[in-house]
Amino acid sequence: MLDRNSKSVLVAFYRSGNIFRYNQCSDSMETSTISSPSRRIRNNFLGLLGTRGARLSRLSWGNDTSKS
C-alpha cells in the first residue's frame, strides 16, 4: 500500500516536472534526518523508487523526454 502511494507521488513529480526541485528538497532535508529517522527511511525508500521510476520513465516516455 505504501509502495503504491509512493509510486503515485513519484509519477506526480515526474509529470509536473519538479524532479530537480524534489532533489533540492531532499538534499536540504538531509540535515534534519538526525532528528527524524522516520523521514530518513522514507527518503531512502523514495530514493530507491526514484531510480527505478527514472528507468521506467525512460522506457515508456522515450521520445517525450528527449524532446523536452
UniProtKB/Swiss-Prot annotation:
Pfam families recorded for this chain?
A: DUF1199 (PF06712)
Taxonomically, the superkingdom here is Viruses
Protein name as it appears in the record: Uncharacterized protein ORF3
